[in-house]
């Protein structure tokens, strides 16, 4: 325990001995907030009495007068604390003992007073009542600013992710990211609602993981004595709802994949998936363009976004290029019609690692990921994927070896994925059986056979298009972050060893 922590615990005991509860249970009525006060104050207006609560972020004690910077949920404001105003009677202990000696930076206080403007022109609150609301036992890192420069900033990445609560306190920009994240989610939700689509909830705990090629997290249901899996995707449940008669459904889905962590992957992540009857992937491309253009204008006020040296333009239309053509464009190799052995030769020629468990689809995916994907900065639809890469997708109407699928690539990574959904139950069963063969071959991302989903398709599913957008990645783009961990409040990390 540090010297500061020991000192604060002694202050805690002293407060208790004086009959002051350092963690009172009573409601504290807050009537005003810092930004409202700064925006609404006029010197010629009647005296404005306010009640504010927040955390003490700095303090300057100058004898009988002190200045405090108070941080509430929306910003900061200066408090002017004068001994005689705070303690109008003979007993001055609240100022000289409690405020000056027993309170610390980081403590939560509630204050009442009136708003005024100092001689230096800073809107402040003249305090005449002060209540301790919560005693802080650990000192905050001190971030100093001068002439637009920040010093001693709390910028250790691992520390910021592990102690996000401290990061939110001392780094204003961090909180701004997550406020914008909420606005982005609300914008997507309102866009779907305006189209008349229904928001639904589907199971997170599943007996069969489906809807994506990914390794699931495995758990066990004790009461039923069966293995269960955390959801890797919600696709198959949303399609069941289309079978059941919903024409348009969507869900913000928390998904879990037992895979690696990097700048665009976290084991736990959020996507939004939408399924609309009587549509195809061409319609969905137009819909996706409209949605992203709308969101950018609503959140940013523009369809243009500057990230590093690039200006990304979300104004429709976006470029469309087939998977076969995009690989040829970047490698000079035309993979059309190649079998698995030929694709392995291409991988070796391009110095891409491959192993015997990889199917043709996986090999093509590796070529695209290693040699192509990262080069596409402007929004680009990669369309018409080989059949083996897309076991839930309808065959292309002009080429049975391809599927009606697209991925939207922006800033070098996948943002969205969509299909003309496969609704032929016989073809779907065969695709699942092909996946089972890949699983036996050693592909740990191959899909399970979901018999209930096949039964649902046998009742009939109308022509449907579905699309999923990685919400964390969308937030990354619109907040100009280079790592997915920056847009997750609590990104997954190796457990920390704590000693007490």
UniProtKB/Swiss-Prot annotation:
Cofactor binding, note field: Binds 3 Mg(2+) ions per subunit.
Superkingdom in the source lineage: Bacteria
EC number(s) given by UniProt: 6.1.1.6
Reaction it catalyzes: tRNA(Lys) + L-lysine + ATP = L-lysyl-tRNA(Lys) + AMP + diphosphate
Residues reported to bind Mg(2+) 2: 414
Gene3D superfamilies membership: Bira Bifunctional Protein, Domain 2, Nucleic acid-binding proteins
A GO biological process held by the record: lysyl-tRNA aminoacylation
MF terms in GO: ATP binding; lysine-tRNA ligase activity; magnesium ion binding; tRNA binding
A single GO cellular-component term on record: cytosol
UniProt keywords, alphabetically: Aminoacyl-tRNA synthetase, ATP-binding, Cytoplasm, Ligase, Magnesium, Metal-binding, Nucleotide-binding, Protein biosynthesis
Cofactor needs: Mg(2+)
Chain positions recorded as Mg(2+) 1 binding sites: 407, 414
Localization: Cytoplasm
Family: Belongs to the class-II aminoacyl-tRNA synthetase family.
Quaternary context: Homodimer.
Protein name (record): Lysine--tRNA ligase
Organism, as annotated: Azobacteroides pseudotrichonymphae genomovar. CFP2
Annotated gene: lysS
């Amino acid at each position: 325990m540090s010297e500061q922590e020991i000192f604060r615990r002694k202050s805690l005991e002293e407060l208790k001995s004086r009959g002051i509860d350092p963690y009172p249970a009573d409601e504290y009525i807050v009537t005003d907030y810092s930004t409202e006060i700064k925006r609404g104050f006029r010197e010629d207006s009647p005296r404005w009495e306010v009640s504010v609560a927040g955390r003490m972020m700095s303090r300057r004690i100058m004898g009988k007068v002190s200045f405090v910077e108070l941080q509430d949920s929306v910003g900061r404001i200066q408090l002017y604390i004068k001994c005689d105003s705070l303690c109008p009677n003979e007993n001055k202990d609240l100022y000289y003992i409690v405020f000056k000696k027993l309170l610390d930076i980081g403590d939560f206080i509630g204050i009442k007073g009136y708003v005024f403007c100092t001689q230096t022109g800073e809107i402040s609150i003249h305090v005449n009542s002060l209540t301790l609301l919560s005693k802080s036992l650990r000192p905050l890192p001190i971030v100093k600013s001068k002439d637009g420069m920040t010093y001693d900033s709390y910028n250790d990445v691992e520390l910021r992710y592990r102690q996000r609560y401290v990061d939110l306190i001392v780094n204003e920009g961090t909180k701004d990211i997550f406020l914008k994240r909420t606005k982005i989610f609300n914008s997507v939700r309102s866009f779907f609602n305006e189209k008349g689509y229904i928001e639904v909830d589907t199971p997170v705990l599943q007996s069969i993981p489906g809807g994506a090629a990914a390794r699931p997290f495995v758990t066990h249901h004790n009461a039923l004595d069966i293995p269960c899996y955390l959801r890797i995707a919600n696709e198959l449940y949303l399609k069941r709802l289309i079978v059941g008669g919903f024409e348009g459904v969507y869900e913000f889905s928390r998904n879990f994949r037992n895979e690696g962590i990097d700048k665009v992957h976290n084991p736990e992540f959020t996507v939004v998936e939408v399924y609309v009857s009587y549509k195809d992937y061409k319609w969905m491309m137009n819909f996706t363009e409209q949605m992203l253009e709308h969101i950018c204008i609503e959140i940013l006020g523009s369809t243009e976004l500057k990230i590093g040296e690039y200006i990304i333009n979300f104004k429709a239309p976006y470029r469309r290029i087939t998977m076969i053509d995009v690989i040829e464009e970047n490698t000079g190799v035309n993979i059309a019609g190649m079998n698995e052995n030929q694709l392995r030769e291409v991988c070796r020629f391009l110095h891409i690692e491959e192993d015997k468990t990889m199917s043709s689809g996986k090999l093509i995916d590796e070529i695209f990921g290693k040699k192509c994907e990262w080069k596409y900065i402007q929004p680009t639809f990669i369309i018409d994927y080989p059949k083996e890469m897309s076991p839930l997708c309808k065959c292309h109407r002009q080429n049975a070896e391809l599927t009606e699928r697209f991925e939207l690539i922006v800033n070098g990574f996948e943002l969205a994925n969509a299909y003309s959904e496969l609704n032929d139950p016989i073809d779907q069963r065969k695709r699942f059986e092909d996946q089972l063969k890949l699983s036996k071959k050693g592909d740990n991302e191959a899909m399970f056979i979901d018999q209930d989903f096949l039964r649902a398709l046998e009742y009939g599913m109308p022509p449907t298009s579905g699309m999923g957008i990685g919400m964390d990645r969308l937030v990354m783009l619109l907040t100009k972050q280079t790592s997915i961990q920056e847009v997750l409040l609590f990104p997954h990390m190796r457990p920390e060893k704590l000693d007490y």
